[in-house]
């Protein structure tokens, strides 16, 4: 289904973090000059957008790049929550024509019900890969997250191009076992964990989100079992404002794990 064959090798992808915050960041209370995280979203090579949330155009405007999404013809949606999916953002992206949205069928219905038109929808089934016209292979993996729409599979993604790939693991609590098996098979060159919780013992959000102690446990297994590539780089996104201190504190907390917390506007090469 919509699968093309590409034989590129040694393709380096660039991932731009458009937002790195969880849903408790209030953009209406942002203070100019103070550190702020938008809702989590990412852009691959200025071509593939992951999660068209309500803050993506604010990122472009505040950074003086109003044409940032000019070449975006593919959008991949992890799940239906409002900090990750915004119908008005999709409509603006679709205005130029030729937009394809890769998502769970329940997400497609939500967007259609919100009046999104002029878009090609490609339904995603966990672990059945699809390839965009630009040659990005999207491997949808099951995530451990909720609540969700009736019948919705919430997703994480492995994004591949050529022989390079990365795992985008938000939103999710403990990584699902079948998703772990696919990570071991693909051996991604980078992993983006979500880190909503920070250190929150006794917080039941751990059943759908991730904190630093959970990342430490999963990382130990990933490295011991040679899941991601041996030289893989590890990052975090989706940090809650109310469950973390400063970004500098988070840098220090994650340093012993050799994990880098992302910030809005950060670029990495995969």
Protein language model annotation of sequence segments:
Residues 103-155, 160-162, 259-268:
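Metallo-beta-lactamase
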Residues 46-48, 95-100, 165-166:
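Short active-site oxyanion
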Residues 64-125:
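Active-site HxH/HxHxD metal-binding segment of metal-dependent hydrolases
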Residues 2-12:
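Short, Lys/Arg-enriched N-terminal segments with co-localized hydrophobic residues
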Residues 49-53, 71-83, 87, 102-105, ...:
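Active-site neighborhood of phospho(di)ester-bond hydrolases with catalytic His/Asp-centered motifs
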Residues 23-80, 86-92, 177-183:
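Pre-active-site segment of Zn-dependent metallo-hydrolases
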Residues 14-20, 49-51, 136-144, 165-172:
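Active-site-proximal beta-strand elements of phosphoester/diester hydrolases
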Residues 175-269:
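Cap/insert and terminal regions of metallo-dependent hydrolase folds
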